Amino acid sequence: MKLLIVAVGQRVPDWAQTACNDYAKRLPPELKLELKAVKTEPRAGKTLASLLAAERGRIEAAIPRGAQVVALDERGTRLTTLALAERLRGWQLVGDTVALLVGGPDGLDPALRQAAHERIRLSDLTLPHALVRVLLIEQLYRAWSLHAGHPYHRE
């Protein structure tokens, strides 16, 4: 199974990239992780709707046909770590690729959010985008570790 994170924004601080790489390499070979960063649309006098639509086009171009699409959204379903572990298990049964979408500074285009198979939130807090990437990959690793019986997660 492939976990594809499609994130708006190409600049990530070194500390965040290091953390993402660390958790990604801990995942087993059967859970391939790929991060595709797409360009943030420059504001330059554009409306919010046109900015989000441009980013939506880039995100959609990065999602393979047939992928299960999960949008990270502040209004999405609140999950516990155990619930995310169950979701991960379910995604593994559904198909080859799960695309997890991380919006830019203005979030995701409403049409993209609506078209997603599922919407989840990582936190009730507003988080910096670099931290969202780290947190998401860490939580995916933690979810895998629960089902694998790995001692990483403690109750």
From Swiss-Prot:
Keyword Magnesium on entry: no
Record-linked InterPro entries: Alpha/beta_knot_MTases (IPR029028), RlmH-like (IPR003742), tRNA_m1G_MTases_N (IPR029026)
Keywords of this entry: Cytoplasm, Methyltransferase, rRNA processing, S-adenosyl-L-methionine, Transferase
Record EC number: 2.1.1.177
Compartments, record wording: Cytoplasm
Any one of the GO CC terms: cytoplasm
MF terms (GO), sorted A to Z: rRNA (pseudouridine-N3-)-methyltransferase activity
Binding site for S-adenosyl-L-methionine: 72, 103, 122-127
Keyword Transferase among UniProt keywords: yes
Catalytic activity as recorded in UniProt: pseudouridine(1915) in 23S rRNA + S-adenosyl-L-methionine = N(3)-methylpseudouridine(1915) in 23S rRNA + S-adenosyl-L-homocysteine + H(+)
Top-tier EC class: transferase
Family per similarity comment: Belongs to the RNA methyltransferase RlmH family.
Quaternary context: Homodimer.
HAMAP family (UniProt xref): 23SrRNA_methyltr_H
Family matches, as PANTHER family: METHYLTRANSFERASE, RIBOSOMAL RNA LARGE SUBUNIT METHYLTRANSFERASE H
Described purpose of this protein according to its UniProt entry: Specifically methylates the pseudouridine at position 1915 (m3Psi1915) in 23S rRNA.
Protein name listed in UniProt: Ribosomal RNA large subunit methyltransferase H
Species for this entry: Verminephrobacter eiseniae (strain EF01-2)
Species classification: Bacteria, Pseudomonadati, Pseudomonadota, Betaproteobacteria, Burkholderiales
